[in-house]
């Protein structure tokens, strides 16, 4: 007598697998949502701290310009690629047997990032005053000098922000959501703490 396949056990297994997958998606979405909310709140605190310690002065404008330029490069490169390209590519190699290829791809992207962005940073350091003038919108000469000085300090962040974007895509593909979800929140928290601790002694 031939045994009949146990479809009920297969259906039960499929249901449990689907339930686990949906629970994982819900958990990941919750972590990302909490990270975004905390980041927004800390962003508001950051702006309040800057206004409190420096007021509506040219110093705030100088800092805003110097900090936004690295963010422009991040949004243009790694920030824009994470959801569109990096996560799908990384996810296709996320299985344990493909981890070697995953590390090779990550290493290649980080190396490519250094090769492309290092000359950009160097040129930015050389022409910081000209860049500050282009994006300043009619600042005074003194504020323009401060902007150029701050820009030379913040330009290397172009490299680190894009590194963080690539590694965030890697962590998302490996289903590790906490660190990349709170990445922006930690960035804003760092600015808040530095403003509170060093505003009076170091200024902007």
Locations of the language-model features?
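Membrane-embedded alpha-helical bundles of multi-pass transporters/translocases
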Residues: 2-204
